């Protein structure tokens, strides 16, 4: 939906670099890959993700994710300390060094937490991760590239400040609530 509504993928580019932040990989990467396949593109695309290292094999569909990662040659990065924690600057630098500074046409910040027990603090509890995703995207995106960032609410001043910061680095900023989102 976001890909089509905002025309964020230029199919004249034969080799795309896509980076998913706090994504293991998730639905947005799957949509990106399927979109590129529909145009018989994507064979040369480079796909990277950084995600928290998860050793719990009880997570539903984790084996399905592993099959997806192998099939589409997704490079999972766990950072310099092998945790995948974006709160650590060394891990952001490690990812930028692996992918290439300002080399990506598309970056997504798709991190989130389980807020089912504390929904009222969702925005506040997400601010640190959102800031880290912004820092990483600014180091990864090409000039003219696209950054899709998932945020939950826009009530706090700091969230508005983040949007203002993004407006200084990106030509356009859009807000949307996709139909399938929570």
Cite the ranges covered by each PLM segment:
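Short "lid" loop at the C-terminus of a central beta-strand within the Rossmann-like core
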Residues: 53-54, 153-156
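The AdoMet/dcAdoMet-binding core of the Class I SAM-like
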Residues: 1-115, 119-136
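Class I S-adenosyl-L-methionine
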Residues: 161, 165-182
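Short, surface-exposed connector motifs at secondary-structure boundaries
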Residues: 11-15, 142-148
